Protein backbone atom coordinates (compact mmCIF):
# COMPACT_ATOMS: atom_id res chain seq x y z
CA UNK A 1 0.00 0.00 0.00
CA UNK A 2 2.89 2.36 0.65
CA UNK A 3 4.01 1.95 -2.98
CA UNK A 4 0.54 2.87 -4.20
CA UNK A 5 0.37 5.84 -1.85
CA UNK A 6 3.76 7.06 -3.07
CA UNK A 7 2.71 6.57 -6.73
CA UNK A 8 -0.46 8.60 -6.29
CA UNK A 9 1.27 11.33 -4.28
CA UNK A 10 3.86 11.80 -7.02
CA UNK A 11 1.15 11.99 -9.69
CA UNK A 12 -0.95 14.42 -7.65
CA UNK A 13 2.06 16.66 -7.05
CA UNK A 14 2.81 16.69 -10.77
CA UNK A 15 -0.80 17.45 -11.69
CA UNK A 16 -1.04 20.21 -9.11
CA UNK A 17 2.15 21.82 -10.45
CA UNK A 18 0.44 21.88 -13.85
CA UNK A 19 -2.61 23.60 -12.38
CA UNK A 20 -4.85 20.54 -12.38
CA UNK A 21 -6.67 20.39 -9.07
CA UNK A 22 -9.72 18.21 -9.69
CA UNK A 23 -8.43 14.65 -9.48
CA UNK A 24 -10.11 11.44 -8.37
CA UNK A 25 -8.04 8.56 -7.00
CA UNK A 26 -8.87 5.14 -8.48
CA UNK A 27 -6.78 2.33 -6.97
CA UNK A 28 -7.59 0.20 -10.02
CA UNK A 29 -9.18 -2.87 -8.54
CA UNK A 30 -8.64 -5.82 -10.86
CA UNK A 31 -5.85 -4.25 -12.91
CA UNK A 32 -2.45 -5.99 -12.65
CA UNK A 33 -3.18 -7.17 -9.11
CA UNK A 34 -3.76 -10.53 -7.49
CA UNK A 35 -7.00 -11.24 -5.69
CA UNK A 36 -5.11 -10.96 -2.40
CA UNK A 37 -3.67 -7.58 -3.37
CA UNK A 38 -7.13 -6.30 -4.27
CA UNK A 39 -8.48 -7.29 -0.86
CA UNK A 40 -5.47 -5.74 0.89
CA UNK A 41 -6.21 -2.46 -0.89
CA UNK A 42 -9.89 -2.66 0.03
CA UNK A 43 -8.99 -3.31 3.68
CA UNK A 44 -6.60 -0.34 3.76
CA UNK A 45 -8.51 2.01 1.47
CA UNK A 46 -8.69 4.68 4.18
CA UNK A 47 -4.91 5.14 3.90
CA UNK A 48 -5.53 6.86 0.57
CA UNK A 49 -7.50 9.54 2.42
CA UNK A 50 -4.15 11.19 3.24
CA UNK A 51 -3.99 12.24 -0.42
CA UNK A 52 -6.89 14.67 0.11
CA UNK A 53 -8.64 13.62 -3.08
CA UNK A 54 -11.91 11.78 -3.69
CA UNK A 55 -11.54 8.00 -3.84
CA UNK A 56 -13.33 5.97 -6.49
CA UNK A 57 -13.96 2.25 -5.98
CA UNK A 58 -14.90 0.04 -8.89
CA UNK A 59 -15.30 -3.53 -7.66
CA UNK A 60 -18.67 -4.32 -9.24
CA UNK A 61 -18.59 -7.81 -10.82
CA UNK A 62 -14.79 -7.98 -10.59
CA UNK A 63 -12.88 -11.26 -10.60
CA UNK A 64 -11.80 -10.57 -7.02
CA UNK A 65 -15.44 -11.27 -6.15
CA UNK A 66 -16.50 -14.05 -8.48
CA UNK A 67 -13.32 -16.18 -8.57
CA UNK A 68 -13.14 -16.91 -4.82
CA UNK A 69 -16.87 -17.69 -4.90
CA UNK A 70 -16.41 -19.92 -7.98
CA UNK A 71 -19.23 -18.27 -9.84
CA UNK A 72 -19.71 -15.77 -12.67
CA UNK A 73 -19.73 -11.97 -12.76
CA UNK A 74 -23.50 -12.03 -13.25
CA UNK A 75 -23.98 -13.95 -9.99
CA UNK A 76 -22.06 -11.77 -7.54
CA UNK A 77 -24.55 -9.03 -6.74
CA UNK A 78 -24.60 -9.86 -2.99
CA UNK A 79 -20.79 -9.93 -2.92
CA UNK A 80 -20.66 -6.66 -4.84
CA UNK A 81 -23.01 -5.00 -2.34
CA UNK A 82 -20.87 -6.30 0.53
CA UNK A 83 -17.70 -4.93 -1.10
CA UNK A 84 -19.40 -1.58 -1.76
CA UNK A 85 -20.46 -1.37 1.87
CA UNK A 86 -16.92 -2.11 3.02
CA UNK A 87 -15.61 0.54 0.62
CA UNK A 88 -18.01 3.08 2.13
CA UNK A 89 -16.78 2.09 5.59
CA UNK A 90 -13.25 2.72 4.35
CA UNK A 91 -14.24 6.22 3.13
CA UNK A 92 -14.81 5.67 -0.59
CA UNK A 93 -16.37 8.76 -2.12
CA UNK A 94 -17.49 7.32 -5.45
CA UNK A 95 -18.72 3.84 -6.34
CA UNK A 96 -18.59 2.72 -9.96
CA UNK A 97 -21.40 0.20 -10.27
CA UNK A 98 -23.30 -1.97 -12.73
CA UNK A 99 -26.37 -2.53 -10.57
CA UNK A 100 -27.57 0.96 -9.71
CA UNK A 101 -30.65 -0.06 -7.73
CA UNK A 102 -28.67 -2.36 -5.43
CA UNK A 103 -25.99 0.29 -4.94
CA UNK A 104 -28.54 2.99 -4.10
CA UNK A 105 -30.15 0.67 -1.55
CA UNK A 106 -26.77 -0.14 0.02
CA UNK A 107 -25.84 3.54 0.19
CA UNK A 108 -29.21 4.42 1.71
CA UNK A 109 -28.86 1.80 4.46
CA UNK A 110 -25.27 2.91 5.06
CA UNK A 111 -26.44 6.50 5.47
CA UNK A 112 -29.22 5.51 7.85
CA UNK A 113 -26.96 3.38 10.05
CA UNK A 114 -24.21 5.99 10.15
CA UNK A 115 -26.47 9.04 10.35
CA UNK A 116 -24.68 10.65 7.42
CA UNK A 117 -25.68 12.00 4.05
CA UNK A 118 -23.08 10.93 1.50
CA UNK A 119 -24.52 12.98 -1.32
CA UNK A 120 -27.57 15.09 -2.00
CA UNK A 121 -27.78 13.46 -5.41
CA UNK A 122 -26.75 10.09 -6.69
CA UNK A 123 -25.73 10.30 -10.29
CA UNK A 124 -27.11 7.49 -12.40
CA UNK A 125 -25.29 7.18 -15.68
CA UNK A 126 -26.17 3.86 -17.31
CA UNK A 127 -24.03 2.76 -20.20
What are the functions of these language-model segments?
Residues 1-21, 32-127:
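Active-site-adjacent loop and "lid" segments of alpha/beta metabolic enzymes
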Residues 28:
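Conserved Motif II region of HX4D acyltransferases
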Amino acid sequence: MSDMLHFFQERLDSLHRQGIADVVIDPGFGFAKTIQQNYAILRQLDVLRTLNAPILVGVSRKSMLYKPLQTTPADVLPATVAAHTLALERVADILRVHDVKAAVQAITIYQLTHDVQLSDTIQKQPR
